[in-house]
């Protein structure tokens, strides 16, 4: 029997697969209603801000040959409504499922306010601090690119809440290792990486960008080598748990990310091809591990053999 159980701060995962933040909304999108979320290791909810936000102009999503470009923005009803309606319903339906809430904001005070309210609700097991979303003009982008700011923000949130916090890193930086170290210095319990890579595509007939917001975040197959490289670099400087993401669409991808240094993974863009991608990946994982003669998935963490 292959062991796929992974124990991370605040998150006791029956398997290392979860949806990336935003993928399944607050557990209320059609795909999330089509299967039992208990089949996954955890549920990660959409980024929550202090007040309701409407997101970016349409079109918000462009499906590319090898990935997805999105500028959805942090559309959510605000933290109070997320707790009273969305999370209460999700927790009622899934009493034992580990739930991670994603925290966003325009200022340090925003982040602290949202984190405190989510922590105090008793409805979630861990917080993911979204310092990296490249979609919103006044949003998290600026926080995630400066090591000093990341450290300070992490410290403030850590002092304000009892829950474990995972800082979600943006790849749109000069040195990802420096930012990861800053998160660790600030007291992060773990790291999520990578968020989307800032990009743009243009329609040659109209000469207009494909997205209403012009630029957006690239995810999917195209960013996988970037994600694997960055996770590997960060794993070499920290023992913090890493939740890896960026182009995962198969159980084999999961193994590759774990070899690079991830402890668990999040699946996002693969759901555009297969709305039950995370479920299918989790189901296929034991057989893939068995093929490789692996008895415990935890034994693979960071075990890449460099040339």
Curated annotation (Swiss-Prot):
UniProt record, GO biological process: 'de novo' pyrimidine nucleobase biosynthetic process; 'de novo' UMP biosynthetic process
Catalytic activity of the protein: (S)-dihydroorotate + fumarate = orotate + succinate
Disulfide bridge partners, by residue number: none
CDD domains xrefs: DHOD_1B_like
Binding, substrate: 46, 70-74, 130, 195-196
Keywords: Cytoplasm, Flavoprotein, FMN, Oxidoreductase, Pyrimidine biosynthesis
Pathway(s) where this gene product acts: Pyrimidine metabolism; UMP biosynthesis via de novo pathway
EC number(s) reported in the record: 1.3.98.1
Recorded GO MF terms: dihydroorotate dehydrogenase (fumarate) activity
Active site (record annotation): 133 (nucleophile)
Enzyme class of the recorded protein, top EC level: oxidoreductase
Annotated InterPro entries: Aldolase_TIM, DHO_dehydrogenase, DHOD_1B, Dihydroorotate_DH_1, Dihydroorotate_DH_1_2, Dihydroorotate_DH_cat, Dihydroorotate_DH_CS, Dihydroorotate_DH_I
GO cellular component, one term: cytoplasm
Localization: Cytoplasm
Functional note: Catalyzes the conversion of dihydroorotate to orotate with fumarate as the electron acceptor.
Subunit structure: Homodimer.
HAMAP family: DHO_dh_type1
Protein name: Dihydroorotate dehydrogenase A (fumarate)
């Amino acid at each position: 029997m292959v062991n796929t159980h992974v124990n991370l701060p605040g998150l006791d995962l029956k398997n290392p697969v979860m949806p990336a933040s935003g993928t399944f909304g607050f557990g209320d999108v059609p795909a999330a209603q089509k299967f039992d979320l208990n089949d996954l290791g955890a549920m990660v909810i959409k980024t929550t801000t202090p007040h309701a936000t409407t997101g970016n102009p349409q079109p918000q999503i462009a499906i590319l040959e090898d990935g997805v470009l999105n500028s959805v923005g942090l559309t959510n009803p605000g933290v109070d409504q997320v707790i009273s309606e969305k999370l209460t319903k999700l927790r009622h339906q899934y009493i034992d499922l580990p739930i991670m809430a994603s925290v966003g904001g325009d200022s340090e005070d925003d982040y602290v306010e949202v984190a405190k309210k989510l922590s105090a609700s008793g409805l979630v097991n861990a917080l993911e601090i979204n310092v990296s979303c490249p979609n919103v003009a006044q949003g998290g982008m600026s926080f995630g690119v400066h090591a000093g700011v990341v450290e300070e923000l992490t410290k403030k949130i850590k002092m304000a809440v009892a829950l474990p916090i995972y800082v979600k890193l943006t790849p749109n930086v000069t040195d990802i290792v420096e930012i990861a170290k800053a998160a660790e210095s600030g007291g992060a319990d773990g790291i999520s990486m990578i968020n989307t890579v800032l990009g743009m595509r243009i329609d040659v007939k109209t000469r207009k960008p494909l997205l209403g917001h012009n630029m957006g975040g690239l995810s999917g197959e195209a960013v996988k080598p970037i994600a694997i490289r960055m996770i590997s670099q960060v794993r070499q400087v920290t023992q913090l748990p890493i939740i890896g993401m960026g182009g995962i669409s198969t159980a084999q991808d999961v193994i590759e990310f774990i070899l690079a240094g991830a402890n668990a993974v999040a699946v996002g863009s693969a759901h555009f091809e297969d709305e039950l991608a995370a479920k299918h990946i989790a189901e296929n994982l034991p057989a893939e591990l068995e093929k490789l003669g692996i008895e415990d998935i935890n034994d693979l963490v960071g075990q890449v053999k460099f040339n």
